[in-house]
Amino acid sequence: MSLSVTRENFDEWMVPVYVPAPFIPVRGEGSRLWDQQGKEYIDFAGGIAVNALGHAHPALREALNEQANRFWHTGNGYTNEPALRLAKKLIDATFAERVFFCNSGAEANEAALKLARKYAHDRVGNHKSGIVAFKNAFHGRTLFTVSAGGQPTYSQDFAPLPPDIRHAAYNDLNSASALIDDNTCAVIVEPVQGEGGVIPATKAFLQGLRELCDRYQALLIFDEVQTGVGRTGELYAYMHYGVTPDILTTAKALGGGFPIGAMLTTQNYASVMTPGTHGTTYGGNPLATAVAGKVLDIINTPEMQNGVRQRHDAFIERLNTLNVRFGMFSEIRGLGLLLGCVLQTEFAGKAKLIAQEAAKAGVMVLIAGGDVVRFAPALNVSDEEIATGLDRFALACERLQTGGAPCG
């Protein structure tokens, strides 16, 4: 007999680095979840842009079960067929010629930053070690990546931090230009700042970074952990902008809910990462890569990408209609199915309250700071689920605006 557990047990047994919702999901199907009490939720959070095909997708379950019945793990002393097939699919679909598999976005970004430093040290000299990142970015929770993130709240308790990392203002080419020089080995940027407020980069900004990196022989790293694998209506957001990075990191949606990350680059840059310079125990394991291979098969199609663009339009239309009614948002922005609603001044700081009320009404949403409500639903969310979920979201907005009876 299994142990009966409640939300209160989290506070008793777990390290308190999270404050989970008061309910515990126990079952999912598509874009719907049910909690321990059987209450249904429309999921517009998507595991923070992870569940690209929703919950318990039949094809992903089949891929996982098929590999689970073969073998699970061998370690990096051996390769495996699912990893090799996934690497080839990523190479065929992108600019990349080499792939490094890991377990998360943070690990992918850690690998990217290490590669950039080593390439510069090997080809130019140890003085070329500077990294330029951007304020309010998010690249992971390792000491290196959290230092690159440019959010002191996440890094200030862990000093001394890795040196030679400077932060420019996002979407401000003049600010970046003032920091990028001959000592810069890499520039790391999100095509859309997710945690920083769902802020898409301008094309001119990314083009300018590409030109600056070329001028100073620095590597341009695109962190596509949140924007990648179809999220923006292209397989990767760099395709939307027409700006090709030297290194791309991907994770989240790549596994559709199964942990996996990857760093993509060219043969020239990858050549400095010789045996022993970097590694991972679980990265590229056959379970993760079998699932990710199926995710790519489903998402990397014109039909799926066109569907994302159509669903983007449906979300925007309904959110604009909702905003006419409530007037709570000063801006609705984003690309594809990564969307952010910026709260008006009178509701500043209340994004979390809206998310909590939304859950009571039966819809799960995210926040991106205190002033932005974020949506990152499954890429195959249905029109009916969009309509139902946003009707429930409207109840939460009404509750916050009027102070009426709680939802649910």
UniProtKB/Swiss-Prot annotation:
Key word Transferase present: yes
Pfam families: Aminotran_3 (PF00202)
Cofactor(s) it depends on: pyridoxal 5'-phosphate
GO terms, molecular function: identical protein binding; pyridoxal phosphate binding; succinylornithine transaminase activity
Keyword Transferase: yes
Example GO BP: arginine catabolic process to succinate
Taxonomy, superkingdom: Bacteria
Keyword line: Aminotransferase, Arginine metabolism, Pyridoxal phosphate, Transferase
EC numbers for this chain: 2.6.1.81
Assigned protein family: Belongs to the class-III pyridoxal-phosphate-dependent aminotransferase family. AstC subfamily.
Role summary: Catalyzes the transamination of N(2)-succinylornithine and alpha-ketoglutarate into N(2)-succinylglutamate semialdehyde and glutamate. Can also act as an acetylornithine aminotransferase.
Name by which UniProt lists this protein: Succinylornithine transaminase
Organism field: Salmonella newport (strain SL254)
Primary gene name: astC
